[in-house]
């Protein structure tokens, strides 16, 4: 289950003014509209809370709560179900990287799940997707044990961790770093990046997206969510979208198709150093310890703190 706790201190909200470090001035001048919230790094190690609404009480939410109906359920992995929801309210929108409050009739607890589909899918088909890992928390347990085609729920968008460039913004390169089911919001961003590339290639208009690299770590290849979709994007946008998969407990042979993209072991500073530069924006999502170590690695590579955005899941 992917739940929001915050992002790093990168303040590029539309309409927000402030003083930024000189070393980031050039990037800030070219930065697109990003959603982010200042977060004291000490909160990274704060005690775990179990309630999504408590954790996100001070986080932005839209006013619209839309009815939704489950229209497709698939097994993304042995432990993760991918759920497609048909959204009833046509005014309902979201930005790549955001999440939803998930309301289930008869279940008192409200779920909080990152959206793994892109805004374009909602615009064209009226649906969004969630990928939910099994656990005993009531909303996640309901999805794995009781949710069926036609089940009715309600959703509300929230979150300040997103990528929403405007057509007039200058090109920008991204680094996406995911751990486990922390891939969800980053996959949404990656799909949105692909849509931006398609739009610019077909029309010559809109935001001109730079290059993106995804680093994604999971226990084994079976737990690498969306891996086929990700490889399809890499093939469709050679050089513009690249990826590096990392596995920490792989016990079976890796299939031939995945082998060129697989590295055994966690994502290290050396891995990041081969690609990361000081003029990129870095998005991180995963367990708090993974975020803490990755932030330190990026700072060691001289990436300004203002260019490191993160979101925790629990």
Swiss-Prot record:
NAD(+) binds at residues 180-185. InterPro entries: FAD-bd_FR_type, FNR_nucleotide-bd, Oxidoreductase_NAD-binding, OxRdtase_FAD/NAD-bd, Riboflavin_synthase-like_b-brl. Its EC number is 1.-.-.-. Gene3D superfamilies: Nucleotide-binding domain of ferredoxin-NADP reductase (FNR) module, Translation factors. One of its GO terms (molecular function) is oxidoreductase activity. Keywords: NAD, Oxidoreductase, Signal. Residues 1-18 form the signal peptide. The keyword Membrane does not apply. The keyword Oxidoreductase applies. Residues 63-166 form the FAD-binding FR-type domain. It comes from the Eukaryota. PANTHER family: OXIDOREDUCTASE NAD-BINDING DOMAIN-CONTAINING PROTEIN 1. This is Oxidoreductase NAD-binding domain-containing protein 1. It comes from Xenopus tropicalis. The lineage of its organism: Eukaryota, Metazoa, Chordata, Craniata, Vertebrata.
